[in-house]
Amino acid sequence: MILFPAVDIKDGRCVRLRQGRADAETVFSDDPAAMARHWQDQGAKWLHVIDLDGAFSGMPANFELIRRICADLSVPVQLGGGIRDEATAKAYLDAGVERLIIGTVALEEPDLYARLCATFPGRIGVSLDAEGGRLKTKGWVADSGLTVDDVLPRLLAAGTAFVIYTDIDRDGMQTGVNLSALERLAGMCPVPVIAAGGVATLEDVRALYPMTLTSSVEGAITGRAIYTGTLDLHAAMEWIAAQ
């Protein structure tokens, strides 16, 4: 099981949003690169980095900072936010990002998404961000009108390497993972599935762990909980290693 600590970047700072709302922001550090190193030092095997400015604007906004984070770390980085053309994808991969998370393009520009998967095999994943069962785009501010069932077969056929499932209703709310929705999605996915939204305590990690042994669930992204201290990342990593 992999726990992915989240480093969300907005205005050059490390922040967390509640339910993706830009007006519900908490700043946790003025130095995202130092924060990324801290999570690596705590035992993280991967980092989950989101360019929130890019997600809202549709173009990269923190490229140099993200390049520096990748250069500083010895663990791989997965990155999302504002990746909406091939040139941006290539630039980030060349800068040291291990794999890319595509959201808006995957739903709105299927031909471009398929081309990204073909051009960078094994390195392109999709973020399915659901609120009330409907998928959101453009930094979670637009309703696509689509559901997971509508889009998943096409995304898998295109060559999706991994799937991140965000339950927006639980994002930043620290209410536990939506295990039933995750289990249903994993049953439809032959590629790794990563849960996002709701991981708040070691109990949530323990509840999710069995699913990583019996399904395609690879792990979970954790954000607010490790910043506020309701989840001790180092202790969680040690618990996983002991299983």
Swiss-Prot record:
The pathway entry for this protein reads as: Amino-acid biosynthesis; L-histidine biosynthesis; L-histidine from 5-phospho-alpha-D-ribose 1-diphosphate: step 4/9
State the top-level EC class.
Answer: isomerase
Q: Where in the cell is it found?
A: Cytoplasm
Q: Which gene encodes it?
A: hisA
Matching NCBIfam families:
1-(5-phosphoribosyl)-5-[(5-phosphoribosylamino)methylideneamino]imidazole-4-carboxamide isomerase
Please indicate if the UniProt record lists Transferase as a keyword. no
User: What is the species listed in this Swiss-Prot or TrEMBL entry?
Assistant: Nitratidesulfovibrio vulgaris (strain DSM 19637 / Miyazaki F) (Desulfovibrio vulgaris)
Record EC number: 5.3.1.16
The UniProt keywords, alphabetically, are: Amino-acid biosynthesis, Cytoplasm, Histidine biosynthesis, Isomerase
User: Mind telling me what this protein is named?
Assistant: 1-(5-phosphoribosyl)-5-[(5-phosphoribosylamino)methylideneamino] imidazole-4-carboxamide isomerase
